[in-house]
A protein has these predicted regions:
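Basic, polyanion-interacting recognition surfaces, primarily
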Residues: 1-106
Length: 106
């Protein structure tokens, strides 16, 4: 299920999926190809995921905190997992601007 996926992380020509149960499984494609596959397979539900920088695709439902000075993105479900992902400062600034923009539209 989509809700079980916390994030995808690039690992060279492959990537890993990390689940809410903290299980890490390899996927035989790079992050860009995975991003296209998610769009194709999930349709409207693909918006559940957001590409952040070069290394991550994150489940937006679990974004908790954007820490630009420490270059960390905290994602959590407040129960089973909390991950602190190292993200570039520029990617975090773009994410924060996107979150602010979508919050203002509501």
């Amino acid at each position: 299920r989509i809700t079980e996926i916390a994030y995808f992380e690039s690992d060279g020509n492959y990537c890993n999926v990390v689940t809410a149960n903290k299980l890490r499984s390899p996927i035989g494609m790079n992050l860009t190809n995975l991003e296209h596959a998610l769009d194709k397979q999930l349709g409207n539900e693909a918006t559940t995921f957001i590409r952040i920088g070069k290394r991550f695709i994150v489940n937006k439902r679990y974004i908790c905190k954007v820490n630009i000075p420490k270059q960390r993105l905290v994602i959590t479900d407040y129960d089973r997992f909390t991950f602190q992902l190292p993200i570039s400062r520029d990617a975090l600034k773009q994410l924060k601007a996107l979150i602010t923009l979508s919050t203002e539209k509501k």
